[in-house]
């Protein structure tokens, strides 16, 4: 009885510990785990099938094979429990002890552990200061090593070959020095290490050393010595004397039919080790010659290596079928390893899968579950109910009833299923909406029915997709499924806070058709008194759905009082108005318009924000019913004739053809270069394609009274299916195609699919199609991998506290590009916390500090015309672990303040990773087929207003045209109140058509420029003189073969024999031949970069604003622009972009220094202080001229900057803004909306570490990477002891690196490089306190997020209670049942809202 009580008293296995520690096992430890030594390589006796004694499956060591039965059968049954049989030596107990009891092998010679030997950096090598190569030569018996030189001239750790060793013995005598070979020598060396003295010596050396390489090495060694001291491991434990043998049930031997056996590879590997070990023992007993013993020892070392990590050194040992054997390391590694296969992802019971079909008559919270499936899934519940209602007396009887499918079983199934939610999942589960809970409705048939509105979230369609069903069993699980995962509770997308339950396809089309209004329809001008009248009229066919009529509408006014208004509308819209909830924020005007997909989404959003969740769900369901009904009634379909080919198409194509011929002629005459011709041709055709498409849309969109609206147009315009781009290919012209390399083929496809393509056109178009398919396959895998890395880096970002109390934040501004505001300020600050009082121009506070900015606040901000707002950000949050609620702001999926315990890191990772599959894989050349229309060559005002110039540097030409001379000139348009409406970047060399203070109206041209060349322009009048422009060295006359026209082009001069010191430039002289100086006091000289085409002759007179040379754009721009997924990955991995830009670290003027062989020297000279020197590759196009003033962080040349540089020069906020901008650009191009805070969360995880620059009195070392929180804690500790604190700089790490450096070694090991992570953790004796999500999943606990966070808090509460009770009873010490006693701790009172 006592034993039974013990079973109840046990705390469940996973809850019984707080942390997991890993360290190196000492030989004593290994022996203490073991239940006996394994001496024989035999496994089981092939006749009796019983395990051999002392073999790998020995029952005496590992326990009985059958429950409570010894091997010889003398003792059977429970009553002999615990007795050890004297005949066969087997303990009578449960057979499952064979899963937990270990054995060991005593090795006849020590053997090095391959993980500590080979995994880089080699731990053994660092400790005894030998290279890996030397170590291996000693280990595998090639060389001797001097362990103790004595008084001989030999050096410590010197390598001696066999002959050298023999010679040394003869010369100095055998006892004068010690040299060893094999693992014994290394073990002796490790044993002689005194860690403490080594540490002090190294610290002294580190202080005195001057060489950088030496310092790095010392720091590495110091770290390892420190690790050993802290973990309490001894270095010689890295050399094994005993090997543990894992329990036999974990490496089973299963009999197959036909007398053969299937076995785990580990048994082979163990047998090898045992055989060699036994042979070695015998050889030593026999006193065999040294060389034989040595060979045997080497073989033993190799077999142990193979057991631990097969294939790490030398060739992998293969089994009978030439396949490498799976070693212990392989069991853990990779997708099929223990971590990812069995611990992070398990297969679950009570689940099924089937094809899905559409279920339009379901409610949003329902799904149709096939009866057969439901019966199987809910079997235990059905059995219990059958017994409860006395239909069956035993489970067996109940089982028989269910198998026969008796009628009462179905009734009971109905009852069991009522209000018991099930979870549906569609693979791939890319974000959390890929699993949602529904209430099952029993249906006939074998397919699961899915509600159409949740298809967007699941990314499901009904072309054969399958979904899996899971049943939450426990009450808690059902509760969570209902409250958190029910489809009705997931109306908003966690990525951007917009509704994700949106009508698509047919529903959109139906609503569009319903809300069309057309002239000349039947019943136009009628007036109706009520909705019922309208319905009668529609049924009697007196009036059409789309006629313009007047109707009386019952609605509410601004204050919510019921009123009756007369409205001009259509019968269709009136039908829709019946569904709209009554609310002041939802006037009739929201639906009294043509509803396209986006409009419907907006309506749903408004309903959700103002009327709450329940109303929204009902509204969506009814809208869906209405949409389907009318899509069916409308009978919209299309035929070939609906695709109207524009009559002007032939003319447009002919015109463009003529234009292209003219370009061809200009090229023949030598007026333009090959590259310019290509650009112009491509542009002309792009333009033509667009014109044809526009004409086609005009034709198709024509609405004539009495004729039905064009069906294709309706589908595309409503957003149901198809797009203008697809229609363009069907009825316009296909346009230009790209080659596989990404270049555009000059000849376009003039035909469309309706006319049909010619053979040549068809051939040209296959390129793109094939590339598309190849891309898609690659993309999916890459995107999945990106998501995995993101989840891994962010998994421990959890909301832990309400407010961290920081005053820091970041500045939010609207995103402006090409003059258009892409993301308004409101969009960026909505749902964030204000980091300071936001004031109007007159000083009234709009939003106080610490308040969350809601929708109505955003309206106030926009009215006040505020340009920038300081908001709290995850990046500046000062919570010690995790993130605080205030810095995060609104939970996007709920629209309310974020809850404590929300796993925001994983949500961020999913939100960024999920659209990954939509991003392109292509790396564009400037001008990938779809990527560019005509090059932009001018800017036009988008608003009326007044011009304000920034960085205005212009020069007036003789014709009084203003030419922009500044590299970063911007034109702003402001309204009367001086608020910025738009801003445009004006490139260098543009003609400025307006000026400071002028008024412009919308559509005015502000500036124009040549899009294909970058000009080099003079600022003064004078005579142009060539300098270092040497014919045949730095300048070549290039004659175009096709045209015979020649032009002077600057060529790559630094490879020429005479050209190394040249600096090709044009200088200006006045009439007296003296150099002209510019306004900034420097002489007027203009450097010519490679490929510049000279526009002036030597000695020619030039006026201000004249062009001296043109740099063709393709010359400076053939760099690929990395787009799409690769760009996102490059940013998150913090890689240096190829052809990266160098940025200035200080403000100052630019000067050119003396050049080196292949680099140009550029100096930035500040007002005061030392100039900073940069080396730029020669011939790269610089974005600046000599004498320009650059600001800190400005790029000095073309290209993307390196994120690390931005962090170093400009700080964390600038880096965050850069990352957000760049990543958002990629997603915006695909039309994907992601909230900034997700990118901020990932950026925070990338910025967790700091690099020590000055250790002060702390224990840190220079250059060490330390976690930010650890750094602060250590500094506070040092300050308390009146020491000097350490200094550090923030470090940016890529997501892979950051994941591998997390606090938790379990999480890192399950991500990548498992052996390396575990080796490192073992050496430093790390303990994992199970703070993140992954570690807890692996040990089988609730994750510390959401409801799990609450459980953790309760557990901590209970533990402190127990401790208090125990302390108070300390005197009499009554035994207290701890966590086993099931009591509900009182929850702390909820704070008053």
Swiss-Prot record:
E.C. numbers? 2.7.7.6
Q: Which GO terms describe its cellular component?
A: DNA-directed RNA polymerase complex
The prosthetic group or cofactor this protein requires is: Mg(2+); Zn(2+)
Cite the cofactor comment.
Binds 1 Mg(2+) ion per subunit.
Positions with a binding annotation for Zn(2+) 2: 804, 877, 884, 887
Residues annotated for Mg(2+) binding in this entry:
461, 463, 465
Give the Pfam families listed for this entry.
RNA_pol_Rpb1_1 (PF04997), RNA_pol_Rpb1_2 (PF00623), RNA_pol_Rpb1_3 (PF04983), RNA_pol_Rpb1_4 (PF05000), RNA_pol_Rpb1_5 (PF04998)
| UniProt KW keywords | DNA-directed RNA polymerase, Magnesium, Metal-binding, Nucleotidyltransferase, Transcription, Transferase, Zinc
Q: State the similarity comment.
A: Belongs to the RNA polymerase beta' chain family.
**Record NCBIfam families:** rpoC_TIGR
Q: How does it assemble?
A: The RNAP catalytic core consists of 2 alpha, 1 beta, 1 beta' and 1 omega subunit. When a sigma factor is associated with the core the holoenzyme is formed, which can initiate transcription.
Known role: DNA-dependent RNA polymerase catalyzes the transcription of DNA into RNA using the four ribonucleoside triphosphates as substrates.
- Its name, as the record gives it, is DNA-directed RNA polymerase subunit beta'
- The record lists the organism as Rhodospirillum rubrum (strain ATCC 11170 / ATH 1.1.1 / DSM 467 / LMG 4362 / NCIMB 8255 / S1)
């Amino acid at each position: 009885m006592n034993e039974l009580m013990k079973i109840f008293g046990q705390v469940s296995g996973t809850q019984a510990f707080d942390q997991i520690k890993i360290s190196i096992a000492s030989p004593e430890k290994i022996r203490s785990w073991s239940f006996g030594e394994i001496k024989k390589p035999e496994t089981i006796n092939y006749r009796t099938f019983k395990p051999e004694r002392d073999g790998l499956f020995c029952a005496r060591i590992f326990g009985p094979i059958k429950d409570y039965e010894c091997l010889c059968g003398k003792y059977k049954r429970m009553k002999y429990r615990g007795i050890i049989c004297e005949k066969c030596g087997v303990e009578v107990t449960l057979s499952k002890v064979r899963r937990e009891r270990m054995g060991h092998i005593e090795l006849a010679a020590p053997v090095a552990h391959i993980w500590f030997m080979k995994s880089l950096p080699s731990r053994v090598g660092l400790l005894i200061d030998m290279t890996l190569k030397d170590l291996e030569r000693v280990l595998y018996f090639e060389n001797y090593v001097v362990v103790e030189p004595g008084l001989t001239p030999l050096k410590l750790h010197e390598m001696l070959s066999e002959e050298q060793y023999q010679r040394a013995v003869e010369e100095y005598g055998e006892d004068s020095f010690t040299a060893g070979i094999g693992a014994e020598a290394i073990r002796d060396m490790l044993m002689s290490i005194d860690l403490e003295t080594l540490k002090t010596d190294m610290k002294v050396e580190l202080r005195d050393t001057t060489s950088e390489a030496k310092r790095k090495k010392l720091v590495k060694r110091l770290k390892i010595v420190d690790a050993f001291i802290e973990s309490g491991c001894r270095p010689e434990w890295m050399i094994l004397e005993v090997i543990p043998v894992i329990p036999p049930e974990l490496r089973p031997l299963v009999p197959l039919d036909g007398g053969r056996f299937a076995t785990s590879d580990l048994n082979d590997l163990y047998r090898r080790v045992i055989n060699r070990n036994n042979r070695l023992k015998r050889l030593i007993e026999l006193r065999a010659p040294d060389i034989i013993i040595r060979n045997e020892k080497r073989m033993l070392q190799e077999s142990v290596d193979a057991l631990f990590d097969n294939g790490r050194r030398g060739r992998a040992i293969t089994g009978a079928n030439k396949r490498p054997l799976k070693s212990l390391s392989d069991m853990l590694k990779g997708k099929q390893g223990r971590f990812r296969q069995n611990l992070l992802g398990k297969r679950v019971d009570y689940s099924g899968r089937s094809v899905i079909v559409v279920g339009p008559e379901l409610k949003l919270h329902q799904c149709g579950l096939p009866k057969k499936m439901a019966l199987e899934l809910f079997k235990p519940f059905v059995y219990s109910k059958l017994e409860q209602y006395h239909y069956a007396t035993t489970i067996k009887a109940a089982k028989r009833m269910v198998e026969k499918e008796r009628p009462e079983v179905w009734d009971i199934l109905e009852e069991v299923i009522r209000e018991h939610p099930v979870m549906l999942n569609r693979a791939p589960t890319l974000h959390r909406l890929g699993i949602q809970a529904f209430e099952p409705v029993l249906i006939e048939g074998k397919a699961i029915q899915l509600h159409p509105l949740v298809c967007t979230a699941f990314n499901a369609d009904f072309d054969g997709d399958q979904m899996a069903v899971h049943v939450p069993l426990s009450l808690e699980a059902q509760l969570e499924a209902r409250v958190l995962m029910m489809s009705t509770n997931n109306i908003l997308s966690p990525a951007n806070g917009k509704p994700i339950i949106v009508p698509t396809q047919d529903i959109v089309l139906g609503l569009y058709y319903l809300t069309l209004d057309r002239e000349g329809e039947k019943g136009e001008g009628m007036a109706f008194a009520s909705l019922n009248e309208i319905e009668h009229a529609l049924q009697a066919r007196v009036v059409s759905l789309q006629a313009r009529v007047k109707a009386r509408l019952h609605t509410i006014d601004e204050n919510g009082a019921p009123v009756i208004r007369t409205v001009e509308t259509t019968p269709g819209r009136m039908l829709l108005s019946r569904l709209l909830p009554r609310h002041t924020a939802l006037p009739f005007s929201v639906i009294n318009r043509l509803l396209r997909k986006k409009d419907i989404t907006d309506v749903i959003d408004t309903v959700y924000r103002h009327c709450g969740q329940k109303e929204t769900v009902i509204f969506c369901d009814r809208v869906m019913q209405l949409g389907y009904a009318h899509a069916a009634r409308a009978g919209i379909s299309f035929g070939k004739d609906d695709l109207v080919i524009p009559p002007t198409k032939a003319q447009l194509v002919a015109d463009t053809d003529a234009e292209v011929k003219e370009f061809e002629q200009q090229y023949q005459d030598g007026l333009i270069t090959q590259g310019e011709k290509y650009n112009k041709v491509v542009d002309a055709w792009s333009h033509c394609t667009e014109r044809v498409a526009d004409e086609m849309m005009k034709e198709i969109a024509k609405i004539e009274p009495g004729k039905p609206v064009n069906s294709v147009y309706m589908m595309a315009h409503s957003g149901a299916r198809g797009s203008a781009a697809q229609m363009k290919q069907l009825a316009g012209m296909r346009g230009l195609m790209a080659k596989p390399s990404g270049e555009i083929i000059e000849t376009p496809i003039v035909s469309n699919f309706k006319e049909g393509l010619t053979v040549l056109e068809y051939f040209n178009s296959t390129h793109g199609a094939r590339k598309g398919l190849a891309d898609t396959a690659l993309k999916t895998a890459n995107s999945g991998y990106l998501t995995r890395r993101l989840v891994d880096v962010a998994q421990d970002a959890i909301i832990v506290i309400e407010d961290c109390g920081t005053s820091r934040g970041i500045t939010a501004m609207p995103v402006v590009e090409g003059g258009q505001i892409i993301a308004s300020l409101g969009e960026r600050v909505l749902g964030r916390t204000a980091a300071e009082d936001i004031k109007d121009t007159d000083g009234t506070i709009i939003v106080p500090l610490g308040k969350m900015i809601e929708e109505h606040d955003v309206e106030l901000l926009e009215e006040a015309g505020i340009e920038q707002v300081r908001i709290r950000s995850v990046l500046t949050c000062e919570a010690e672990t995790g993130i605080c609620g205030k810095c995060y702001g609104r939970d996007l999926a709920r629209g309310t303040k974020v809850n404590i315990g929300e796993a925001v890191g994983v949500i961020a990772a999913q939100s960024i990773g999920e659209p990954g599959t939509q991003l392109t894989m292509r790396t564009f050349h400037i001008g990938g087929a779809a990527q560019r229309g005509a090059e932009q060559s001018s800017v036009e005002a988008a608003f009326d207003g007044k011009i304000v110039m920034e960085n205005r540097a212009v020069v007036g030409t003789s014709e009084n045209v203003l030419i922009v001379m500044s590299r970063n000139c911007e034109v702003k348009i402001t309204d009367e109140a001086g608020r910025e409406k738009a801003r445009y970047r004006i490139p260098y060399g543009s003609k400025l058509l307006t000026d400071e203070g002028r008024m412009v109206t919308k559509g005015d041209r502000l500036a124009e420029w040549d899009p294909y060349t970058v000009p080099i322009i003079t600022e003064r009048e004078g005579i142009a003189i060539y300098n270092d422009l040497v014919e045949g060295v730095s300048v070549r006359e290039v004659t175009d073969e096709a045209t015979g026209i020649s032009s002077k082009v600057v060529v790559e001069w630094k490879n020429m024999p005479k050209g190394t010191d040249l600096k090709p430039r044009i200088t200006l002289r006045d009439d007296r031949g003296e150099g002209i100086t510019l306004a900034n006091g420097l002489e007027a000289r203009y450097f010519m970069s490679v490929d510049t085409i000279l526009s002036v002759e030597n000695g020619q007179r030039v006026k201000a604003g004249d062009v001296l040379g043109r740099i063709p754009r393709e010359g400076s721009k053939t760099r690929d622009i990395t787009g799409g997924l690769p760009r996102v990955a490059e940013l998150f991995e913090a890689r240096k972009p190829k052809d990266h830009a160098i940025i200035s670290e200080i403000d100052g003027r630019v000067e050119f220094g003396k050049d080196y062989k292949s680099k140009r020297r550029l100096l930035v000279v500040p007002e005061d202080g030392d100039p900073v020197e940069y080396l730029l590759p020669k011939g790269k196009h610089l974005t600046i001229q000599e004498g320009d003033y650059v600001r800190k962080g400005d790029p000095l040349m073309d290209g993307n900057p390196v994120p690390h540089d931005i962090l170093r020069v400009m700080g964390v906020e600038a880096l965050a803004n850069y990352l957000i901008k760049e990543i958002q650009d990629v997603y915006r191009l695909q039309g994907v909306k992601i909230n900034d805070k997700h990118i901020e969360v990932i950026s925070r995880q990338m910025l967790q570490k700091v690099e020590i620059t000055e250790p002060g009195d702390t224990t840190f070392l220079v250059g060490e990477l330390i976690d930010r929180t650890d750094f602060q804690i250590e500094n506070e500790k040092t300050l308390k002891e009146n020491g000097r604190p350490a200094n550090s700089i923030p470090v940016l790490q890529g997501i892979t690196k950051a994941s591998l450096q997390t606090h938790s070694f379990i999480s890192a090991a399950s991500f990548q490089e498992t052996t390396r992570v575990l080796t490192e953790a073992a050496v430093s004796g790390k303990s994992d306190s199970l703070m993140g999500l992954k570690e807890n999943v692996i040990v089988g606990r609730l994750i510390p997020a959401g409801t799990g966070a609450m459980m953790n808090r309760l557990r901590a509460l209970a533990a402190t209670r127990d401790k208090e009770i125990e302390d108070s009873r300390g005197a009499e010490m009554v035994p207290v049942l701890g966590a086993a006693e099931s009591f509900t701790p009182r929850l702390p009172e909820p704070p008053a809202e």
